[in-house]
Amino acid sequence: MDLVVGRVVKAHGVTGELAVDVRTDDPEGRFVAGAVLRGRPARGGAEREFVIESVRSHGDRMLIRLQGVGDRDAADALRGTLFLVDSAELPPIEDPDEFYDHQLEGMAVSTTGGQPVGTVAEVLHTAAGELLAVRDPDGAEVLVPFVSAIVVSVSLADNAIEIDPPEGLLDL
């Protein structure tokens, strides 16, 4: 399964640097000089491999220079490109209470009382912590803080998450 680890937002400057939204918990390990990235263009087309020349932080994004991307026009052509990795390449997680986002997405969510809540559509990473965006069958979405006081259990084997929501959380 392909996982998105970054997305090209725009060109930065005139020398071909790219402003990239990072979507990995290991940016220092994944976005380093010499690393090879697999890119999928936003507007279709064939995937390509890119070699990183340099990386630097810029606010909440990274500025990345790729081999062969030497000016603003070449960088603009990559706008929207998704950088991907195969989930099989990810190292196993040793902590039983930690999960990769893709492991949680698609899981069924129910309360400790057995009431179905919905399915995890996305894991959101915020400054305050992680949130599970849970979508019900009608398409309504509720955000559930991914904290032990609310998320009682996660079963990869059963593809299920059990929550004990505080009063009113599911009514928002």
UniProtKB/Swiss-Prot annotation:
Coiled coil: none
Domain PRC barrel residues, every copy: 96-169
GO cellular component: cytoplasm; ribosome
Protein name as annotated: Ribosome maturation factor RimM
Organism this protein belongs to: Mycolicibacterium vanbaalenii (strain DSM 7251 / JCM 13017 / BCRC 16820 / KCTC 9966 / NRRL B-24157 / PYR-1)
NCBIfam families noted in UniProt: 16S_RimM (TIGR02273)
Single Gene Ontology MF annotation: ribosome binding
UniProt xrefs under InterPro entries: PRC_barrel-like_sf (IPR011033), PRC_RimM (IPR056792), RimM (IPR011961), RimM_N (IPR002676), RimM_N_sf (IPR036976), Transl_B-barrel_sf (IPR009000)
Subunit structure: Binds ribosomal protein uS19.
Keywords: Chaperone, Cytoplasm, Ribosome biogenesis, rRNA processing
Compartment list: Cytoplasm
Lineage start: Bacteria, Bacillati, Actinomycetota, Actinomycetes, Mycobacteriales
Comment block on domains: The PRC barrel domain binds ribosomal protein uS19.
Record keyword DNA damage present: no
